[in-house]
């Protein structure tokens, strides 16, 4: 592949004008290597002294003495590794571009690497070296003088642009120029630049010295020391006389006085043999991609090729002598004609198969203890019942083999299965690019060991001209971290990014190459990839994340998204955000190094797309054609990761973008980056995770995106945030993710995304059917808005894209929220990509690692991508995802918006959120961003953020819209909350949870179940009391937009932040999903809202919230709540809700906690820390101080209030509603669970879900009711739970829940019918849930319902199993719960059984919690597979367990996860959590456990008696548990 276009060689993304002397068709590797493609941009024209000083290989340190001339000096020093010496300082390091311009010879040098040049240059160089020496002597005075390139001999002093030490740039694998003085390798075209210990710089080059302009300058002395690289291990630095005594014609010797021309023949032959054998040694061939590339199918290499290697030419140019030496070498084999040589592989190992490792070694050795059998050198067991017996030679191995086959034949009664191990010295796979590009630095040659020479690591510099392995370059070339599928990917331009990129998602900047062609040489990538079979997408963006963006074949949309080179790229010149662009080292504003013309991209796969319209800067999207071509294929998976990253990235972007909306997409991008940075901590994780492949996210991003997507994508895809971005970049960024997002919803182009999203959405659809429905509706409604908003706000975008996609997908829209969630997830995916570890789960669908390990959040969602998205939602919701998740855009929004939001609307609030949610800063950011995006953007656009929420809201109810319109902030809050919830719920925890983020995060965390909860708590946490309410409401609103309305007004600003964070209301987005959230969320949410509200807001607000929540709680709930009216309803709601609330608070807290934990969004401020959690959350998020107090008082208020209410019929009525909520929760849970179940164990989860639902309802209502509920409904599912419930009820005596019970029963019945679907809440919801929970994304509602029923039955049947396995949700669990808070999962489970009845009563909620926990825990394991966490949760408190269980039950993996900490308890607890809470309310004794659950109920009542404890427990336990629960709900 040629690395040149129109006479320009692109190096490091910069165009070098190729001089005539240089061959334009310099192999890419050559050019690239020559230019340090892998390193920071090489200072092509740095003064030699500077270069030497900086240890930066100068490509054509062509400053000629020109340093003196000043040309190099003129060039501003490039970011060179810190210049080591003053001389370096003296000599201005010229950026590669300048150097290029200044020193055309660079190109020469590049070309120089070619043999021809080498030869010419040898002579020239000799002369040059002489000149150099002269110059250098002169340089003593002018350290700045540059090496002159041989082409321009003496004159070149001033003009020699060409002669530079070419080196890959002493760039470390990280791609950063390494400053190391002594040990740095300097990749010189064919040599290494090293500093001897005395400080002189030596250019270790092989003939390169002769042929190439590799001269090392002594930085200080400015004397050029040319190391004589004799085959001697250590090159001897020879100081050339000023006039360069070296004989220019010593073609074979170094100009620097290479070998003595008079080396004795025998010694020369020995040296040649050593060098040549090294080339064919296994060690060298393992890394010598060039040599391997020159081999034919028989592994023969033309001898003339080897003879041209610099180190060989240094010794001799006599090819006959070389052939003779090769013939004499036992290690190589020369063909009959004497033209080719190949390594002589010894096959001296015999493999004995089917001999177990139990066989005594002596027995195996005894096989060969025969006179007719050669004695083996070693005998060892390899693997797979195989033994390796090594012999001294090939002949011995052959003899032994013959002996075994003909004489022994059997061993231990079995025929001997022996074969001679073929020693393939070369693994000819793509890992070995033909261009000789090395992934690893070449091993130092034995002959010329640079190490001896003072640290030139590369001694045998790529000896061969064709082997342009700049050792250093090679080393650099492959920044270890950067995983180029094929070495071809040489992200030279952005060394700076390597460390980070490599380590994490690639910064978008890298991807920006296309846009800034100059900037990245990704452009090349397109060509290169084309040439090399590398997929373009990986090229730039996600080296690691290779997922083809195929799914994104939204070329068209992509343009909107901008190509990977879009604004998203930090480097992207188009980026408006430019300077801001990114957290990356490079400022976005920085002009592209030299923007290659788009034509550069012409290379095969990449299709440059100029997107002018939507993207402010107009971006060139380079979409790999293949991506375009097959958008749908791998994309989903890839997208998920990539998209996740994109989402994640975009989230930040979203935030920015949402703020800036379309206009500043670039800025957004820019912001995105910063956000990215921010996210790195909390969000990025999320971001990193591809939540959902980032599909939706990207979509969302799209809008935002465009810069973001690319950015995000890039960053995430690259990072995997960027991984997705980049990959997705290609997919997303390039194809649809970035664009798609906009386009997505615009175009839905993201068909590919859709795949990812699809899955996500699908899952989401099912998982978030409700959400989807809501969201869809909302999306649809909002879609229009969202489209605008989306564009404006990533939130919207995501949503929009979701909407679009969802629309495309159908349910997805519905799931828009869900989808959004999913999308959010998608967005998150971007972010997630950073957290790849979770991402896969994402893909698994079972566990979405929402950022934070909110894996299970959308456990349901996980069913597939959708689940992922769902999860993402959840997760996304949680984090950015949450924002995106919920919002779809929400998560993103959360991520992006949040910041944006922050930036925008929440400039102030975000701080609160941010400040408050320290841990969750990200989340807060998320939140804030989300908020920002959601809120700010969404604020305004609340649609956007709301998008998810709004969508949800819209979908959910007028309130949604109302909330939306009603309060952008509110909405936003809601969004935030919703987002958070959804997000949080989904991921909400993470992000939404993150603070509201904090609240939202909390909410988010609780998002699903905690959504409300979280939000509620959030609200509480946020201490917006109103806000929290709103959050809760939002959560609820997610669940129902009702909440939005009232709460919104209260604290829009703060909320916004949170809301923005919440926007990802994945769960909430869709009514159904929302419902599930609502159920969990309603119940939980409501509760949470109540609780949170009550906690955070104070009862009024709480009530208000609850009311809203209740209403939000889904239409069903809303009516109930509304019926209940205000406080009472709140109360009842609170009871139920509070139970939930507490639970939720717990959930919220827990969720947040979990979320934090999961999200890594430390958002809870302690993981929320139990009551503190809610509070902490609150605190974190908002002025904590107040909130906490608020919380405490609120809780207190609520506690009392709740209890009273609980008992009241109002509660019953409300609870009916709430139950519906509960149902919803269940639904959600179920859904989640179901999805999770699908993913993991449906049974377990379903029961959990049911339990959760029931629990929620029952818990919310009262244990009794719950019992009944469970009896009625969850008999099957929660069969064990039923008893548990009953016991709880008994223990509780169900003071308050009889009425509720009735409602609950109904609800339960509905739930039972819905199985996981929770149809009761709303038929639609149930079905949605059923769909979701069934996880059969595709199942129609009816089918879903059937499935739900089946699930319920299964649950019934499996309930006991689960019970036993998960410690089930039965009374045992409850009683165990009490203990559970104190016990490990196993203990809890056992304990549950033993103490179920008595403990249940005593522990009441504690028992309940315990009971739930075990199941939850189990589920969690299933869902999250994070027992430790569960245990921790359990330890945190029974309540935590309860919440967890609920969460788990809810199918919120995160919840489950958290629940896990609780032990097995969490899931069960969670489910029973409500009950437990109720019980707690009823029974203070069970505070530890009760405190978990009681958060909502008892917490208010009792907790406040034991407010501290309760809070602590609640927060902690709740934090863990509530969160869990919430999470479950969320999921």
Swiss-Prot record:
InterPro entries: La_dom_prot (IPR045180), La_HTH (IPR006630), RBD_domain_sf (IPR035979), WH-like_DNA-bd_sf (IPR036388), WH_DNA-bd_sf (IPR036390). Residues 1270-1280 have a biased composition (Basic and acidic residues). GO terms for biological process: negative regulation of cell growth; negative regulation of translation; positive regulation of translation. Residues 112-148, 239-263, 533-605, 710-736, 748-768, 791-1135, 1160-1211, 1251-1285, 1393-1418, 1450-1531 are annotated as: Disordered. Keywords: Phosphoprotein, RNA-binding. Residues 966-975 have a biased composition (Basic residues). One of its GO terms (molecular function) is mRNA 3'-UTR binding. GO terms for cellular component: cytoplasmic stress granule; cytosol. Residues 112-147, 565-578, 754-768, 810-826, 945-959, 1031-1045, 1087-1115 have a biased composition (Low complexity). Residues 262-351 form the HTH La-type RNA-binding domain. Residues 860-884, 1068-1086, 1183-1200, 1467-1477, 1502-1515 have a biased composition (Polar residues). Residues 983-1004, 1164-1173 have a biased composition (Gly residues). It comes from the Eukaryota. Pfam families: La. Residues 348-423 form the RRM domain. The modification Phosphoserine is found at residues 1123, 1370, 1413. The HTH La-type RNA-binding and RRM domains are required for its function in negatively regulating organ and cell size. Probable RNA binding protein. Negatively regulates myc at the protein level, via an unknown mechanism, and may therefore have a role in growth. Has no effect on myc mRNA levels. This is La-related protein Larp4B. It comes from Drosophila melanogaster (Fruit fly).
């Amino acid at each position: 592949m040629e690395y040149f276009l129109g006479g320009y060689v692109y190096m490091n993304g910069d165009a070098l004008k190729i001089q005539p002397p240089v061959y334009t068709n310099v192999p890419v590797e050559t050019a690239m290597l020559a230019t340090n493609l892998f390193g920071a941009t090489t200072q092509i024209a740095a003064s030699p002294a500077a270069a030497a000083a900086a240890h930066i290989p100068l490509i054509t340190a062509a400053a000629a003495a020109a340093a003196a001339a000043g040309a190099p000096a003129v060039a501003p020093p490039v970011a060179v590794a810190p210049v080591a010496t003053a001389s370096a300082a003296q000599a201005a390091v010229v950026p590669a571009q300048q150097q290029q311009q200044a020193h055309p010879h660079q190109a020469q040098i590049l070309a120089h690497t070619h043999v021809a040049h080498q030869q010419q240059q040898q002579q020239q160089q000799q002369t040059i070296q002489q000149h150099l020496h002269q110059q250098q002597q002169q340089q003593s005075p002018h350290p700045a003088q540059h090496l002159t390139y041989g082409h321009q001999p003496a004159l070149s002093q001033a003009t020699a642009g060409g002669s530079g030490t070419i080196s890959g740039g002493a760039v470390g694998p990280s791609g950063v120029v390494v400053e190391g003085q002594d040990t740095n390798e300097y990749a010189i075209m064919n040599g290494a630049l090293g500093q001897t210990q005395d400080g002189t710089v030596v250019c270790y080059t092989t003939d390169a010295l002769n042929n190439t302009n590799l001269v090392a300058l002594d930085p200080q002395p400015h004397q050029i020391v040319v190391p004589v690289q004799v085959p001697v291990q250590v090159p001897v630095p020879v100081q050339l006389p000023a006039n360069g005594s070296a004989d220019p014609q010593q073609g074979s010797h170094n100009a620097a006085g290479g070998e003595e021309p008079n080396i004795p023949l025998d010694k020369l032959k020995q040296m040649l043999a050593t060098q040549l054998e090294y080339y064919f040694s296994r060690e060298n061939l393992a890394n010598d991609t060039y040599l391997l590339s020159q081999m034919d199918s028989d592994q023969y290499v033309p001898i003339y090729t080897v003879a041209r290697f610099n180190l060989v030419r240094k010794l001799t140019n006599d090819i006959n002598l070389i052939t003779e030496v090769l013939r004499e070498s036992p290690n190589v084999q020369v063909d009959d004609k004497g033209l080719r040589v190949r390594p002589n592989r010894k096959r001296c190992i015999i493999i004995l198969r089917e001999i177990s490792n139990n066989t005594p070694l002596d027995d195996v050795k005894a096989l060969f203890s025969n006179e007719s059998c050669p004695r083996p050198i070693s005998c060892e067991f390899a693997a797979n019942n195989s033994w390796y017996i090594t012999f001294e030679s090939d002949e011995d191995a052959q003899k032994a083999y013959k002996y075994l086959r003909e004489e022994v034949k059997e061993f231990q009664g079995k025929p001997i299965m022996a074969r001679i191990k073929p020693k393939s010295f070369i693994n000819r796979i793509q890992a070995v690019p033909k261009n000789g590009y090395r992934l690893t630095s070449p091993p130092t040659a034995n002959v010329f060991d640079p190490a001896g020479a003072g640290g030139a690591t590369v001694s045998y510099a790529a000896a061969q001209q064709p082997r342009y392995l700049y050792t250093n370059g090679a080393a650099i070339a492959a920044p270890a971290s950067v995983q180029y599928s094929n070495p071809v990917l040489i992200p030279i331009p952005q060394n700076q990014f390597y460390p980070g990129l490599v380590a994490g998602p690639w910064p978008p900047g890298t991807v920006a190459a296309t846009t800034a062609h100059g900037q990245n040489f990704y452009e090349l990538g397109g060509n290169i990839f084309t040439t090399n079979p590398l997929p373009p997408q990986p090229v730039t963006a996600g080296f690691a994340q290779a997922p083809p963006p195929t799914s994104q074949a939204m070329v068209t949309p992509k343009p909107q998204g901008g190509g990977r080179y879009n604004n998203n790229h930090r480097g992207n010149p188009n980026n408006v955000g430019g300077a801001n662009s990114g957290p990356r080292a490079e400022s976005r504003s920085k002009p592209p190094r030299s923007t290659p013309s788009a034509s550069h991209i012409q290379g095969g796969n990449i299709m440059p797309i100029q997107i002018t319209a939507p993207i402010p800067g107009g971006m060139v999207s380079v979409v790999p054609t293949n991506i375009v071509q097959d958008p749908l294929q791998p994309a989903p998976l890839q997208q998920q990761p990539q998209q996740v990253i994109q989402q994640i990235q975009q989230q930040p972007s979203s935030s920015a973008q949402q703020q800036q909306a379309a206009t500043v997409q670039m800025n957004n991008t820019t912001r995105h980056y910063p956000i990215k940075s921010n996210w790195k901590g909390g969000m990025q994780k999320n971001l990193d995770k591809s939540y959902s492949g980032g599909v939706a996210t990207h979509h969302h991003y799209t809008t935002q995106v465009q810069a973001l997507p690319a950015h995000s994508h890039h960053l995430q895809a690259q990072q995997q945030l960027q991984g997705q971005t980049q990959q997705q970049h290609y997919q997303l960024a390039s194809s649809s993710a970035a664009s798609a997002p906009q386009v997505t919803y615009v175009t839905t182009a993201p068909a590919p995304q859709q795949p990812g999203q699809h899955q996500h959405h699908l899952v989401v659809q099912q998982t978030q059917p409700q959400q989807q429905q809501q969201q869809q509706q909302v999306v649809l409604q909002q879609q229009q808005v969202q489209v605008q908003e989306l564009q404006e706000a990533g939130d919207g975008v995501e949503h929009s894209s979701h909407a679009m996609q969802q629309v495309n997908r159908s349910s997805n829209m519905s799931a828009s929220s869900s989808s959004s969630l999913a999308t959010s997830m998608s967005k998150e995916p971007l972010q997630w990509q950073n957290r790849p570890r979770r991402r896969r789960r994402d893909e698994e669908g079972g566990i979405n690692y929402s950022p934070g390990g909110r894996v299970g959040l959308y456990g349901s969602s996980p069913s597939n991508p959708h689940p992922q998205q769902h999860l993402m939602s959840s997760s996304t919701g949680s984090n950015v995802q949450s924002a995106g998740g919920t919002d779809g855009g929400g998560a993103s929004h959360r991520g992006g918006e949040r910041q944006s939001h922050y930036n925008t609307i929440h400039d102030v609030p975000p701080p609160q959120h941010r400040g408050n949610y320290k841990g969750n800063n990200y989340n807060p950011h998320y939140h804030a961003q989300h908020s920002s995006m959601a809120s700010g953007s969404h604020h305004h656009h609340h649609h956007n953020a709301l998008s998810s929420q709004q969508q949800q809201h819209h979908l959910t109810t007028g309130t949604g819209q109302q909330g939306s319109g009603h309060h952008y902030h509110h909405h936003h809050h809601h969004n935030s909350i919703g987002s958070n919830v959804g997000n949080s719920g989904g991921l909400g925890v993470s992000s939404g949870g993150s603070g509201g983020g904090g609240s939202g995060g909390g909410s988010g965390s609780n998002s699903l179940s905690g959504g409300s909860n979280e939000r509620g708590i959030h609200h509480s946490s946020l201490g917006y009391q109103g806000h929290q309410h709103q959050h809760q409401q939002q959560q609820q609103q997610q669940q129902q937009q009702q909440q939005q309305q009232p709460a919104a007004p209260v604290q829009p600003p703060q909320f916004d932040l949170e809301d923005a964070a919440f926007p990802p209301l994945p769960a909430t987005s869709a009514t159904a999903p929302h419902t599930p959230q609502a159920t969990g969320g309603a119940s939980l949410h409501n509760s949470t809202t109540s609780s949170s509200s009550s906690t955070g807001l104070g009862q009024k607000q709480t009530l208000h919230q609850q009311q809203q929540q209740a209403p939000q709680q889904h239409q069903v709930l809303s009516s109930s709540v509304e019926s209940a009216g205000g406080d009472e309803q709140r109360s009842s709601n609170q009871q139920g809700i509070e139970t939930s609330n507490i639970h939720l608070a717990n959930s919220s807290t827990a969720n947040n906690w979990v979320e934090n934990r999961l999200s890594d969004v430390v958002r809870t401020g302690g993981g929320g820390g139990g009551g503190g959690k809610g509070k902490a959350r609150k605190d974190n998020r908002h002025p904590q101080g107040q909130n906490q107090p608020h919380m405490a008082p609120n809780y207190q208020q609520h506690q009392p209030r709740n209890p009273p209410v609980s008992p009241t019929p109002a509660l019953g009525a409300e609870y009916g509603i709430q139950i519906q909520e509960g149902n919803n929760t269940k639904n959600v849970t179920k859904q989640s669970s179901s999805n999770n179940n699908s993913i993991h164990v449906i049974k377990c989860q379903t029961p959990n879900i049911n339990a959760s639902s029931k629990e929620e309802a029952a818990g919310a209502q009262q244990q009794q009711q719950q019992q009944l509920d469970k009896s009625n409904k969850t008999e099957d599912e929660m069969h064990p739970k039923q008893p548990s419930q009953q016991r709880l009820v008994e223990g509780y005596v169900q003071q308050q829940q009889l009425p509720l019970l009735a409602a609950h029963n109904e609800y339960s019945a509905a739930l039972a019918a819905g199985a996981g679907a929770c149809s009761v809440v709303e038929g639609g919801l149930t079905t949605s849930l059923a769909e979701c929970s069934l996880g059969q994304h595709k199942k129609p509602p009816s089918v879903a319902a059937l499935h739900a029923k089946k699930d319920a039955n299964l649950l019934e049947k499996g309930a006991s199993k689960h019970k036993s396995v998960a410690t089930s949700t039965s009374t045992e669990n409850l009683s165990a719960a009490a203990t559970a808070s104190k016990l490990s999962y196993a203990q809890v489970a056992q304990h549950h059984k033993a103490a179920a009845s008595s403990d249940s009563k005593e522990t009441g909620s504690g028992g309940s919690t315990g009971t739930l926990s075990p199941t939850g825990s189990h589920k969690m394991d299933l869902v999250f597979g994070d027992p430790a966490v569960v245990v921790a949760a359990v330890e945190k408190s029974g309540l935590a367990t309860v919440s967890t269980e609920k969460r788990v039950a809810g199918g919120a993996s995160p919840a489950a996860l958290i629940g896990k900490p609780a032990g097995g308890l969490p899931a069960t607890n969670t489910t029973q959590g409500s009950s437990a809470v109720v019980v707690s309310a009823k029974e203070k004794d069970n505070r530890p456990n009760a405190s978990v659950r009681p958060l909502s109920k008892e917490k208010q009542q009792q907790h406040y008696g034991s407010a501290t404890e309760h809070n602590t427990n609640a927060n902690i336990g709740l934090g863990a548990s509530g969160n869990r629960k919430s999470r479950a709900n969320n999921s």
